């Protein structure tokens, strides 16, 4: 089993990849427009994936919620393995090394981004974008060597779903571990700040510079 996906081709040969993971209750179409927001020149292969678990009456998610910050271990680890295999296969199929791939997500997708991008057993990526999420607290997840790893974190100050404290905790933990953290708080609820997205265009371009 793999993940349903939607691809946005690069204009020419892809110079890297930009992969985005949606939040709870939506699907691979939700963040698809952000691929062009973040990579307007289409230098990168763009991809979005659908979480493997279904929610009635529609939409998908990545894991069962026990409490905010601590996913259900059984569904989390099953999805972690599935999503990791999908991501690795996508990059291999298109000949893109992990160090030229950016992974990002919103809400549950941000938690999965942290898991897939920070875990000790995973390949090092070019950068991570975590919007309104958290670093998951779950048995079996171990923070790897993140020294110098670019991580962009955005969070709404008035987020009633995932408190901004989770964003601050992720920021502080990653800075302490040596990551290169870009952090933005915005005066809004559980949503994505378009101004931060605009600022991230340059960040994305710098993380995957033009091939020599």
Question: Residue locations for each model-derived region?
Answer:
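Serine-hydrolase catalytic machinery in alpha/beta-hydrolase-like enzymes
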Residues: 1-100
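Active-site signature of alpha/beta-hydrolase-fold catalytic machinery across serine-
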Residues: 33, 115-119
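Flexible "cap/lid" loop of the alpha/beta hydrolase fold
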Residues: 58-65, 133-151
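Short beta-strand immediately N-terminal to the catalytic nucleophile in serine-hydrolase-like folds
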Residues: 103-105, 131
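Gly/Ala-rich beta-loop-alpha elbow adjacent to hydrolase catalytic centers
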Residues: 105-109, 113
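A conserved short beta-strand
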Residues: 123-135
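Short beta-strand/loop motif that positions the catalytic acidic residue
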Residues: 152-155, 159
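C-terminal catalytic histidine-bearing segment of alpha/beta-hydrolase fold enzymes
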Residues: 165-212
């Amino acid at each position: 089993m793999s993940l349903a996906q939607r691809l946005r081709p690069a204009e020419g040969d892809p110079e890297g990849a930009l992969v985005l993971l949606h939040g709870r209750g939506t699907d691979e179409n939700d963040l698809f427009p952000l691929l062009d927001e973040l990579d307007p020149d289409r230098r990168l292969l763009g991809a979005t994936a659908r979480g493997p678990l279904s929610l009635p009456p529609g939409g998908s998610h990545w894991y069962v919620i026990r409490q905010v910050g601590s996913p259900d271990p059984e569904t989390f680890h099953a999805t972690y393995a599935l999503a990791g295999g999908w991501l690795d296969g996508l990059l291999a199929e298109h000949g893109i090394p992990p160090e030229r791939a950016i992974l990002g997500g919103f809400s549950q997708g941000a938690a999965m981004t942290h898991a897939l991008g920070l875990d000790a057993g995973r390949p090092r990526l070019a950068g991570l974008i975590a919007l309104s999420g958290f670093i998951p607290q779950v048995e079996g997840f171990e923070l790897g060597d993140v020294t110098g790893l670019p991580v962009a974190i955005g969070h709404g100050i008035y987020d009633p779903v995932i408190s901004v404290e989770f964003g601050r905790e992720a920021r502080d933990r990653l800075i302490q571990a040596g990551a290169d953290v870009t952090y933005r708080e915005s005066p809004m609820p559980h949503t994505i700040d378009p101004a931060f997205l605009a600022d991230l265009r340059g960040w994305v371009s710098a993380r995957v510079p033009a091939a020599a």
